[in-house]
Amino acid sequence: MARVKRAVNAQKKRRTVLKASKGYRGQRSRLYRKAKEQQLHSLTYAYRDRRARKGEFRKLWISRINAAARANDITYNRLIQGLKAAGVEVDRKNLAEIAVSDAAAFTALVEVAKAALPEDVNAPSGEAA
């Protein structure tokens, strides 16, 4: 059987993995096998969390919009319902940015949404006759 000489390739592979695992704690940054295992886990977490980040930002935008809406005497779901009824097409990201940076413009959007809602929906819960 022919002898396989791959010392250079093996060292390069190990060096690449150890270089990528530089910030890990303990053996995970020094021993090849531990570093390789940790690198696989790290890449899995990164892949998962890139997708989770989108939902987390949406939650943040909704929280900001809801807080600003309640300051203007309307709830988040009524605000969104009113904006859709009025034909205002602004996404939650931009709506949250407006709520944080430009209160006057957000108040104007709230008034548009309130005007587009049916009258019985404008009444606080429990008082609609």
From Swiss-Prot:
Q: Which Pfam families match?
A: Ribosomal_L20
Stored CDD domains: Ribosomal_L20
Q: Which GO terms describe its cellular component?
A: ribonucleoprotein complex; ribosome
Q: Mind listing the GO molecular function terms for this protein?
A: rRNA binding; structural constituent of ribosome
Q: Write out the entry's keywords from A to Z.
A: Ribonucleoprotein, Ribosomal protein, RNA-binding, rRNA-binding
Q: Does this UniProt record's set of keywords contain Ribosomal protein?
A: yes
One of the GO biological process terms: ribosomal large subunit assembly
Output the superkingdom of the source species.
Bacteria
Instruction: Name residues in a coiled coil.
Output: none
Gene3D superfamilies linked to this entry: 6.10.160.10, Ribosomal protein L20
InterPro entries listed in its UniProt record: Ribosomal_bL20, RIBOSOMAL_L20_CS, Ribosomal_protein_bL20_C
Q: Report the function annotation for this chain.
A: Binds directly to 23S ribosomal RNA and is necessary for the in vitro assembly process of the 50S ribosomal subunit. It is not involved in the protein synthesizing functions of that subunit.
Task: Write out the similarity annotation.
Answer: Belongs to the bacterial ribosomal protein bL20 family.
Write down what this protein is called: Large ribosomal subunit protein bL20
Q: Which species expresses this protein natively?
A: Mycobacterium sp. (strain KMS)
Q: Which gene encodes it?
A: rplT
